[in-house]
Swiss-Prot record:
Location in or out of the cell: Cytoplasm
Protein name, as recorded: Leucine--tRNA ligase, cytoplasmic
Outcome after substituting D250R: Loss of leucyl-tRNA ligase activity
Sequence positions bearing Phosphoserine: S167, S720
Quaternary assembly: Part of the aminoacyl-tRNA synthetase multienzyme complex, also known as multisynthetase complex (MSC), that is composed of the aminoacyl-tRNA ligases for Arg (RARS1), Asp (DARS1), Gln (QARS1), Ile (IARS1), Leu (LARS1), Lys (KARS1), Met (MARS1) the bifunctional ligase for Glu and Pro (EPRS1) and the auxiliary subunits AIMP1/p43, AIMP2/p38 and EEF1E1/p18.
Effect the entry attributes to changing A525S: Reduced leucyl-tRNA ligase activity
Species whose genome carries this gene: Homo sapiens
Keywords: Acetylation, Aminoacyl-tRNA synthetase, ATP-binding, Cytoplasm, Disease variant, Ligase, Nucleotide-binding, Phosphoprotein, Protein biosynthesis
Residues that coordinate or bind L-leucine: Y52, Y54, L594, S597
Consequence the record notes for mutating P247A: Reduced leucyl-tRNA ligase activity
Domain of life the protein comes from: Eukaryota
């Protein structure tokens, strides 16, 4: 039962969503054609795209978060009257799908079908996380395949497929790559449709040569790029098998599928004379220990160099005659990268053990230490890097731990012959400031985690995890030349600086071990390949021009683009393995996935007219155009304004229709993506648009919005920990609108965002409550107040609605969706709740329905299904998808401020009343609780008391002189302290200054005004009924502070009224209800001087909560006040011998004699000690 209760509201929302989606589908709301729109372009068009997701699995919440930004933007721009297009393609190009299919095929060959795998234990994952593994990899260079990223925890592909819930019969089909293309794309579309995406699905397609139209489009793009000299042929880094003598692609690998080359900066540490005895035979040669680092930006902080005493090293001769010292394994890699005279040959000149070069003196680039020494580290591994490790103890936990070991342990130094002067003088050098960790992050974290030595592997792994990612994304450089710049922006610049100075080289090795099928361990080699020459000066210059005019919504994104344009060189655009389009002039090569995805947004504009609603482009073409007819000249005509009409059998009006679509929709108004795509895909996107339309800058991208990664409940999303949600799971759990609301609330900046499940649950409740309230208002239309909407609270509410429209409009415009949700839903609902509470005379019908309409429109981009449903409840004939953004009326800021003032005063009075009722601490009081006050006088000040007036004048003077800032308290205190008129009040002055400063931050400069902008007394008097009811008092009066005693006059200031509570004395009477079986009881009540029927009934209602309506209660008195109450009541004769009390009658109380008289029409009557009340 409880379970059902838990899903009722979600089920309600999901039911609405299903109905609304069918309605949109039937009405084809999101299908748009340029030919129909050109007549109505007064407000312009809006074309938005999202990087098509890769089709080797279901879409997850991370994808959904990024694409929600497109979705919300389109929803908003539709309301602003623009013609909106949001198309959605699906990416299948590249190696992962083919590699997975081939892996399955191989498992079936080896182990049968279904496979019977051996019971051998899976390789144990290394628990110690090596420094390099946590560093942010440069995704444009060493791009880990998505297959590796999504492999889950199973060693076998069959197991991975099984974890997706597939049966053995279904899994077999996935051994053919084509089946992946049939299976996952329809599921992606199904999931996205359930989300309610505003997509024109006719324009969707999958990539690769499976779709002949898209294939033809990519071939055209590459022929054009080659024609324009953007594509070159030459050496590029690739995984290579020396034994096989050729590149080793995924399908040729025994292990290491999806592994790519990893780029290091190879640091040259020059050995100084006198050389260690083992190297003495090489006198006259330049000898370098070469260290591979992923963190060139930290090299300013080198204090020493590490080698492992018991590891074998070699010295080999490089192509220019220098000697490099490193491991044999690293030298083998280098020999295929142009380091040696002959490719693949390592000319060894010396074999040595690490201990034989300990204590050698070195000169290292960038560091402030002139000489550093080779010291022992016992944890260096042979399988990564060069076996030589440069030491930066300021930023590497491993290095500070090992250095402290040597400093603390004299015996350890003695064992390896290390002198004190080689270790003790060397202290960590501040290089990077990391928020929360300071400028020596490794020192801080090692102290925090109490790391004792270099053998605390687990703690060191934790330390690295905590500081490396944060350092990359948030670290700020402290060294000259780069001071104040972000690490991620200067990493490449510093690397280039060292390479240009001859102090470093680029070195590559495989990210992980790769074994070829011939059981050969692969290396990274320079091999001939086709590449895009992104480093070419003119191309870079033009792309920089494009970037200048690009809206990035955030400075960090722009800096990231600028940094990328600074270091980006060649990008290999061809592979020999995988799925994709073949290079038109060299068919053995396939175009890789980061290269066929740069201008496909142009294909969206015409796809629906070419491929007939079929993802594979295999259905009949709506224009009757065959793929073979789409020659290079035809594509030129469609996409290039000046291109002549081609020789073709296609009718001119058909090609003009394609051209019209492109000209109408281009350029792309917004592209949204995760920030990790800025250094690769998004930069290539700019480059390729500039290359394809060099003379037409009006076709270049207009805006790019990059967002942070999505956390789930404040933790990283991960399948292995179970903290993971697919898109379809999220909709099942929260409904589409519930999920969308939480996505909007997750975050706006390039910092990590957070999807909080509790927020999604709370959102569901809010949405459900909101629609129920709307239904209630529609049902109670007649009972809502009509006539002029002119009360104080009517006018405040109207102003708050208009202010909400304006603020929310600005937030949507800037794509600050979390803020738009705050101003357009949370604060908007709060304004309604406040109005409902304050409007004691009832809410105004016109305002209530204006509010519902405006709220529905402001929320529609986030929760379109529910808003469409409410739109229908309001009796609107058309879809909300065709509605317009609400028009904001005038905003009376003064009125809004006065309402805020009213809420603050009410809050303060409640607190003061609570304190008044609490007995003073330390005083012995009677056990009797304090009696609640009945009356209150509120004192308001027209002007500040003289001491506050003087203080404020001083503050305002400083504020205006300091460009809107106040100086330190010391400065203010010394000036105020020297003023004779303030001497007496100094104890009060600084607390008053502190209050003003605090309010200045919240409310702005108006807090320094010497008078309020509204009439304080009038605001309180207009709301006196609300205040009286809210505090449950009998009566409140409002007076000026000038009428009060000195203490109040001195402390009362504008905007901060003071008050006095009191108990008005009265005489107690019995209030008796003689009606049988109605649940109303008899009670005692105080009657006070001047009371009338209304005040007594209100007092009764506070005691008898069963009475809801004042007008339903009548009071009567006994004709005989003495004997009447003593007679036994007779059923059916409740009114006998009693007289109704008129509402005009006034009660007079004689406190001395404890008697009460009633005065009515000049007649005075004694009422005794009992009154009758009747409830009808």
């Amino acid at each position: 039962m409880a379970e059902r209760k838990g899903t009722a509201k979600v089920d309600f929302l999901k039911k609405i969503e299903k109905e609304i989606q069918q309605k949109w589908d039937t009405e084809r709301v999101f299908e748009v054609n340029a030919s129909n729109l050109e007549k109505q372009t007064s407000k312009g068009k809006y074309f938005v795209t999202f990087p098509y997701p890769y089709m080797n699995g279901r879409l997850h919440l991370g994808h959904t978060f990024s694409l929600s930004k497109c979705e919300f933007a389109v929803g908003y721009q539709r309301l602003k009257g623009k013609c909106c297009l949001f198309p959605f393609g699906l990416h299948c190009t590249g190696m992962p799908i083919k590699a997975c299919a081939d892996k399955l095929k191989r498992e079936i060959e080896l182990y049968g079908c279904p496979p019977d795998f051996p019971d051998e234990e899976e390789e144990e994952e290394e628990t110690s996380v090596k420094t390099e593994d946590i560093i942010i990899k440069d995704k444009a260079k060493g791009k880990k395949s998505k297959a590796a990223a999504k492999a889950g925890s199973s060693k076998y592909q069959w197991g991975i497929m099984k974890s997706l819930g597939l049966s053995d019969e279904e899994i077999v089909k996935f051994s053919e790559a084509e089946h992946w293309l049939d299976y996952f794309p329809p599921l992606a579309i199904q999931d996205l449709k359930r989300m309610g995406l505003k997509v024109d699905w006719r324009r969707s397609f999958i990539t690769t040569d499976v779709n002949p139209y898209y294939d033809s489009f990519v071939r055209w793009q590459f022929l054009t790029l080659r024609e324009r000299n953007k594509i070159k042929f030459g050496k590029r880094y690739t995984i290579y098998s020396p034994k096989d003598g050729q590149p080793c692609m995924d399908h040729d690998r025994q292990t290491g599928e999806g592994v790519g080359p990893q780029e290091y900066t190879l640091l040259k540490l020059k050995v100084l004379e006198p050389y260690p005895s083992k190297l003495s035979g090489l006198k006259g040669k330049n000898i370098f220990l070469v260290a591979a680092t992923l963190r060139p930006e930290t090299m300013f902080g080198q204090t020493n160099c590490w080698v492992r005493p018991d590891m074998k090293y070699i010295g080999f001769e490089t192509v220019n005659g220098d000697i490099f010292i490193c491991t044999q394994k690293a030298a083998r890699n280098m020999s295929y990268q142009g380091f040696t005279k002959d490719n693949g040959v390592v000319p060894v000149v010396k074999e040595l053990m690490g201990e034989e070069i300990l204590g050698a003196s070195l000169s290292a680039p960038l560091t402030s230490y002139k000489v550093i020494y080779v010291l022992p580290m016992l944890t260096i591994k042979e399988d990564k890097g060069t076996g030589v490790v440069t030491s930066v103890p300021s930023d590497s936990p491993d290095d500070i731990a090992a250095l402290r070991d040597l400093k603390k342990k004299q015996a350890l130094r003695a064992k390896y012959g290390i002198r004190d002067d080689m270790v003790l003088p060397f202290e960590p050098v501040p290089v990077i400031e990391i928020p929360g960790f300071g400028n020596l992050s490794a020192v801080t974290i090692c102290d925090e985690l109490k790391i004792q030595s270099q053998n605390d592997r687990e703690k060191l792994a934790e330390a690295k995890e905590k500081i490396y990612l944060k350092g990359f994304y948030e670290g700020i450089m402290l060294v000259d030349g780069f001071k104040g710049q972000k690490v991620q922006d200067v990493k490449k610049t510093i690397q280039k600086k060292m390479i240009d100075a001859g102090d470093a080289l680029i070195y590559m090795e495989p990210e992980k071990q790769v074994m070829s099928r011939s059981s050969d361990e692969c290396v990274v080699a320079l091999c001939d390949q086709w590449y895009l020459d992104y480093g070419e000066e003119n191309w870079k210059k033009q792309t920089s021009q494009c970037l200048k005019n690009l809206e990035t919504f955030c400075e960090e994104t722009r800096r990231n683009f600028e940094a990328t344009l600074g270091w980006l060189q060649e990008h290999a655009c061809s592979r020999t393995y995988g799925l994709g389009t073949h290079l038109p002039w060299d068919e053995q090569w396939l175009i890789e996935s980061l290269s066929d995805s740069t201008i496909y947004m142009a294909f969206y504009t015409v796809a629906h007219l070419l491929q007939g609603g079929n993802l594979h482009g295999q259905a009949e073409s709506p224009l009757g155009i065959r793929p073979q007819q789409m020659t290079k000249e035809v594509w030129d005509y469609v996409f290039f304004k000046e291109a002549p009409f081609p020789k073709t059998q296609i009718a001119k009006e058909k090609l003009d229709q394609l051209k019209q679509e492109f000209e109408f929709w281009y350029p792309v108004d917004l592209r949204v993506s995760g920030k990790d795509l800025v250094p690769n895909h998004l930069s290539y996107y700019l480059y390729n648009h500039v290359a394809m339309w060099p003379e037409q800058s009006d076709k270049w991208p207009t805006a790019v919005r990059a967002n942070g990664h999505l956390l789930l409940n404040s933790e990283k999303m991960s399948k292995s920990t179970g903290n993971f949600l697919t898109l379809t799971q999220a909709i099942d759990k929260f409904s589409a609108d519930g999920m969308r609301l939480a996505l909007a609330d997750a975050g706006d900046t390039v910092e990590d965002a957070n999807f909080v499940e509790a927020m999604a649950d709370a959102g569901i409740l809010r949405l459900y409550t909101w629609v129920e309230w709307v239904k209630e208002m529609v049902a109670n239309w007649d009972s809502l107040r009509s006539g002029p909407a002119s009360t104080f609270n009517d006018r405040v509410f109207a102003s708050e609605l208009n202010a909400g429209i304006i603020k929310t409009d600005q937030n949507y415009e800037k794509m600050m969706f979390k803020e738009a949700l705050k101003t357009g839903f949370f604060e908007f609902q709060a304004a309604k709740d406040k109005y409902r509470e304050l409007a004691v005379e009832g809410m105004h019908r016109e305002l209530v329905f204006r509010f519902i309409e405006v709220q529905t429109l402001l929320l529609a981009p986030f929760c379109p299904h529910l808003c469409e449903h409410i739109w229908t409840l309001l009796g609107k004939p058309d879809s909300i998808m065709n509605a317009s953004w609400p028009v904001a009326g005038p905003v009376n800021e003064v009125l809004i401020h006065s309402s805020q003032y009213l809420m603050e005063v009410t809050h303060d009075l409640r607190l003061r009343l609570k304190n008044y009722m609490m007995p003073a601490k330390g005083k012995k009081t009677d056990k009797q609780p304090l009696q609640k006050p009945s009356h209150c006088t509120i004192y308001v000040a027209k002007n500040y008391p003289p001491w506050q007036h003087t203080t404020l004048s001083v503050l305002r003077k400083h504020f205006e002189a300091n460009n809107g800032k106040l100086p330190d308290n010391k400065v203010i205190a010394s000036e105020l302290g020297s003023m004779p008129e303030l001497k007496k009040y100094m104890k009060k002055v600084m607390p008053f200054v502190a209050m003003i400063k605090e309010n200045l931050e919240k409310m702005g400069p108006r807090i320094l005004d010497l008078q309020l902008e509204f009439d304080e007394k009038a605001v309180l008097m207009e709301n006196i009924v609300y205040l009286t009811n809210s505090l449950e008092l009998e009566h409140i009066e409002v007076k000026f502070a000038s009428e009060a005693e000195d203490k109040i006059r001195e402390d009362c200031c504008p905007g901060k009224p003071l008050n006095v509570f009191r108990i008005e004395p009265g005489v107690s009477v019995s209030l008796v209800n003689p009606q049988p079986s109605n649940g109303h009881f008899s009670t005692k009540i105080e009657i006070r001087q001047g009371d009338n029927c209304d005040s007594i009934i209100r007092r009764l209602m506070k005691m008898n909560r069963g009475i809801k309506d004042l007008s339903k209660v009548k009071l009567m008195r006994f004709d005989d006040p003495l004997l009447g109450p003593r007679r036994v009541p007779v059923l059916g004769k409740e009114y006998t011998e009693k007289t109704p009390i008129s509402e005009h009658a006034v009660f007079n109380v004689d406190l001395m004699s404890k008697k009460i008289h009633l005065t009515e029409n000049g007649i005075r009557v004694d009422i005794g000690d009992t009154i009758i009340y009747l409830v009808h």
